[in-house]
Amino acid sequence: MPHHIVIVEDEPVTQARLQSYFTQEGYTVSVTASGAGLREIMQNQSVDLILLDINLPDENGLMLTRALRERSTVGIILVTGRSDRIDRIVGLEMGADDYVTKPLELRELVVRVKNLLWRIDLARQAQPHTQDNCYRFAGYCLNVSRHTLERDGEPIKLTRAEYEMLVAFVTNPGEILSRERLLRMLSARRVENPDLRTVDVLIRRLRHKLSADLLVTQHGEGYFLAADVC
């Protein structure tokens, strides 16, 4: 079954261009010009990925990203203006998986979409070596069937990107993972100048949610998980 992409874009020409392009690429595509329209689509259909313009007429796209992350692990790629550097960083902090800037380069955008969908599918298929589908470390239980993290029975909310980065660490316990390798493991990007800041943001977010000393920085080399995994 084709992946379902929702394009949230209020500019008619851009919306039509994106819809045509991704339909030709073989995706199921829905379009809307508002956050309200997006919510209606998500209530009635299964959605794999959202292309979300942060400048919407009815609400702020960054606030919408945060609201989505509170109840969903759907893939989110923000569409921003070329000068909106702060918005891009805030968007990642609020749970977006990636971003692109206008004017859009469609070939790059489709690669980013394919790569995000690839890692979404990979995370869905991930299976641990334990019978109950959990990786256990330092009192935490990462369940790869339900895509959940718990400590002492208490759930810890993770965005999709946070979850996938944690999967990378628990499947490579004690191994130093460079920022470049983590970025490849997260998105397998094949575009020029991949944004390593994405890795830094995710590490900081995970450290805030986990014990701060679990993800250790090896200066000049990368990061590793300082815990036994079983």
UniProtKB/Swiss-Prot annotation:
The lineage of its organism: Bacteria, Pseudomonadati, Pseudomonadota, Gammaproteobacteria, Enterobacterales. Residues 4-117 form the Response regulatory domain. Interacts with TorI. TorI binds to the effector domain of TorR. This interaction, which does not interfere with TorR DNA binding activity, probably prevents the recruitment of RNA polymerase to the torCAD promoter. One of its GO terms (molecular function) is phosphorelay response regulator activity. Phosphorylated and dephosphorylated by TorS. Residues 132-227 bind DNA. GO terms for biological process: regulation of DNA-templated transcription. It comes from the Bacteria. Keywords: Activator, Cytoplasm, DNA-binding, Phosphoprotein, Transcription, Transcription regulation, Two-component regulatory system. GO terms for cellular component: cytosol; protein-DNA complex. PROSITE patterns: OMPR_PHOB, RESPONSE_REGULATORY. This is TorCAD operon transcriptional regulatory protein TorR. It comes from Escherichia coli (strain K12). Member of the two-component regulatory system TorS/TorR involved in the anaerobic utilization of trimethylamine-N-oxide (TMAO). Phosphorylated TorR activates the transcription of the torCAD operon by binding to four decameric boxes located in the torCAD promoter. Box1, 2 and 4 contain the DNA sequence 5'-CTGTTCATAT-3' and box3 contains the DNA sequence 5'-CCGTTCATCC-3'. Phosphorylated as well as unphosphorylated TorR negatively regulates its own expression by binding to box1 and 2. Coiled coil: none annotated. The modification 4-aspartylphosphate is found at D53. Its main location: cytoplasm. It is found in: Cytoplasm.
